[in-house]
């Protein structure tokens, strides 16, 4: 089998690894600008919560007229705020179903370009909401930016995974998550009262998401389309060859094109799949279950509960400056994503995911103990900060970055878009459930709420240990072929997953 455009043959017979070209860097950077916006809009709603609620109150009172109540009912305000947070996920849930259709119709690059229409509209609506005295406009803007993020969550990993060299696919795939966490951190810093988190400037804070959208619109036209899409899906050999030359920096891409031809021949029996075809396929049942459970492990870990409500969590823990503690969590978030970038090709996807889940489970238990003892032991406020920081750090080691790009690795070209849609919908559905329901569950369970996440994390750890294979260093064709040789998840005996069991020996061994 040709070693692929990830490794291009040399005269001495030893296939050198593809170098990192300027075009590859530009393409990855331009793509992950979408992920930056995704993260920004996760974090931007947190710090200015109080001033936005004051705006909601003023808007509501203005509609009541003279002789009305003095303030908005607390239940109404809680519902409006929860809706403002969770509607973002509703937009993502709906648009994630369109990932496969749009990516096949427009191509990966043009789909990302067209998606920016939603970002510009959503940002503009959120920026104008206060001037229009309408929380409905803000909620609509959050819905549109959520729809943008839903498409981004599938399009970016798909594009980056298809243009990345095999030996860098994990590291470059992790940059998607790095951009998300940088976006969260930027939003948290700009949301401080000393920055844009004020009663007059918060609309600008929400509208700033337009800037990376405009930058992406400028840069993406200079980037190549995915050569896998061009050749395997569109059968355009000339444009695919040109794209390969730009990405690899090699004048002769015959070996690279040979791999695509070989993959295309094998996929002639595996045409692009619809959602219904994928869901009914026995061949793809096992990787689909793994993909969905990995997405659930990310969202039901409790991480978005921490990000959405981190300020209020730190307040309940007795932290004097909760907004700054939240930013500290954002810094930890970013630093440990960088750690994951460095480790993912050395330690492997499965190992990092297991480590992250185990660490998060321990931190969730520690957080529960700290919150329970807070009234009797004031120093527990510092323990709670350490627990949250540890929770975030372990998330970014594994459950944060791994699920997004491993879906693209588990599937061949035919079912990949539909699989990304299923995985994306699963992720966004859980995001919505956590965003809408966490505050109510936290009110009911108090400090014990993170024990619920600890139990879920333990379950995901067991599943990953038993069923998730290692994909490091494998081509897409090798991974999909291994699943075709392996019995369905429902038919296997329960035993630990190993790289050798699923993927066979390393071709270099």
From Swiss-Prot:
Cytoplasmic face of the membrane: 1-23, 102-110, 163-170, 222-286, 344-352, 406-416, 466-508
Q: Which residues carry this modification: Phosphoserine?
A: 10, 274, 488
Sequence positions that bind D-glucose = 177, 298-299, 304, 333, 396, 404
**Keyword terms:** Cell membrane, Cytoplasm, Diabetes mellitus, Glycoprotein, Lipoprotein, Membrane, Palmitate, Phosphoprotein, Sugar transport, Transmembrane, Transmembrane helix, Transport, Ubl conjugation
Q: Which tissues is this protein detected in according to the database?
A: Expressed in skeletal and cardiac muscles. Expressed in brown and white adipose tissues.
Lipid anchor positions (S-palmitoyl cysteine):
223
What would be one Gene Ontology cellular-component term for the protein?
membrane raft
Please indicate if the UniProt record lists rRNA-binding as a keyword: no
Subcellular location, record wording: Cell membrane; Endomembrane system; Cytoplasm, Perinuclear region
Topology versus the membrane, per the UniProt entry? Multi-pass membrane protein
Region (Interaction with SRFBP1) location: 7-13
Consult the record and explain the modifications the protein receives after translation: Sumoylated. Palmitoylated. Palmitoylation by ZDHHC7 controls the insulin-dependent translocation of GLUT4 to the plasma membrane.
PROSITE patterns reported in the protein's UniProt record: MFS, SUGAR_TRANSPORT_1, SUGAR_TRANSPORT_2
Mark the residues carrying the PTM Phosphothreonine: 486
- Misc. remarks from the entry: Insulin-stimulated phosphorylation of TBC1D4 is required for GLUT4 translocation.
* Subunit field text: Binds to DAXX. Interacts via its N-terminus with SRFBP1. Interacts with NDUFA9. Interacts with TRARG1; the interaction is required for proper SLC2A4 recycling after insulin stimulation.
Record note on domains: The dileucine internalization motif is critical for intracellular sequestration.
Q: Which PANTHER family match?
A: SOLUTE CARRIER FAMILY 2, SOLUTE CARRIER FAMILY 2, FACILITATED GLUCOSE TRANSPORTER MEMBER 4
Disease named in the record: Defects in Slc2a4 may be the cause of certain post-receptor defects in non-insulin-dependent diabetes mellitus (NIDDM).
Purpose: Insulin-regulated facilitative glucose transporter, which plays a key role in removal of glucose from circulation. Response to insulin is regulated by its intracellular localization: in the absence of insulin, it is efficiently retained intracellularly within storage compartments in muscle and fat cells. Upon insulin stimulation, translocates from these compartments to the cell surface where it transports glucose from the extracellular milieu into the cell.
Q: What is this protein called?
A: Solute carrier family 2, facilitated glucose transporter member 4
What organism does the UniProt record list as the source?
Mus musculus (Mouse)
